[in-house]
């Protein structure tokens, strides 16, 4: 009888063992899946690093220096614009941490002016990470203890999930009482080779206090029988719901009275104490009441305005950043979390002034975030500020957007962000920062200016660190939209943006010195807008959207062909168009070439030859990389060509202004009507902005 009873017990245990092997939510199934590569086991740094580096990587030139552009940050309708240096610093930090470098014991802190995209960058990263983890092979798993009513000391609590979302492999590496025994057990039971085991154990950490305590209770209850112990374990995926704060969680700085360490770490739970009979059980602490435990299983913790927190909270962060561990009353819960934080310059400087707080800064990798200084990229950011929805007036009519609005706003806001320099004028700095041509000045000059400014101890004096931010740009657009002129005309007229900028500068910029500089920058921006309107008027006059572009390219092709060997007496030159690949013929007009160069102020033969050489050099450099390059960023050349064409066609720009301003005779009225028609049908204007633009063109204000 005893033998048969013993035999039947063995059969039951064997069956139970095979059941635990077969269950898809069993630990054995999970270990086998990781072994086969169907699931992954990696820490937070390795996960984020893999997510970024598996995407495409481009090489780009930024402010005269080569850098990398990670394509993953450029996807989606509202993606990250610019921020090349900041993203490169972050990727380097993550990569170092994922390889076990010193970054693993640090937090990454973005410091900069308000409204320059720090929070947006971190939230975008969190969104990418959640999407990355939603792919089945990348999904995070944790474990829970079931059937706890059998143990007797947990009251009505039957199921307990790992409070810090520990990975099932962390449990696997702590199955036995010592690390070595657990490793030997895994190798023996699951036939895991030494190399894979070593790789897993690189991410070894002990179980959190409550998981270890419960696991020990289970061991005592089952008498250490491994198959029986596994029956108490269930593997579950970590929820990816953003609003739960799991995997990616944000902790914004609160006021000094209501905030406490409980918000980060958790606290003793009265509800749990009603059930747990053993007062030594660490499960009496509810860790998920705090923000950290919810992201402790390979997540990202985002601390917004970290240095605004009161001192005792900063001290809590100090321990967490260094030790990667939640500690309450001597109990410890190791965590696997990437900590990213933000701070504005003034709060950071105030914090640095308090010397006793130095240790926390010592444990942070500080990255100074500048405003976007590339006016071409700014067009995307300005489009974000304007919004992609169709605008309406206060009375519900459709609101039109001036085709020059984005350019005017982008140039206006970028110029305020560029520091003054003796080596470069503001316009030269702006053009070089966007990778455009700035006369004789090269990107090397811009690099030197940036390097000199980066020596400044005061961060706000560095390149791009001070200026009107994205929020101020948003306010500017709001002021435009609420004005009566905009609503009555049913159009966001581009020139009105400068009046709105002026209002924002006067109302929101605190320092008088900054206000004076920004207002000066606004005058320069108006001059650039004026030059753009000259071009637009010429295109409208010629009844062709790209008339000026054709004439600029004609000038460039003429100075290339003027020295050609196969140039006949008829001055006809045949060349291959790099954009279309077709063979084209062009008559070289030396009078036209000389007129353009005279307009540029080039009087002597040497000056003209030097200018032509520089244009040919730019052509050689740009066309090989960008066959569609059109020299329209060379504002001086565009202005000269516009002036020459207007003079040759209607005896000077002054005459066009005169004709448009004085419409008493029939001929002038016909010209005005024809230009309005072209602007409406071909150039994207509405009646309001077309009339206002011509009116502005006739005033001759803002000429640089």
What annotation goes with each model-predicted range?
Residues 11-14, 18-704:
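Conserved ASCE/P-loop NTPase catalytic core
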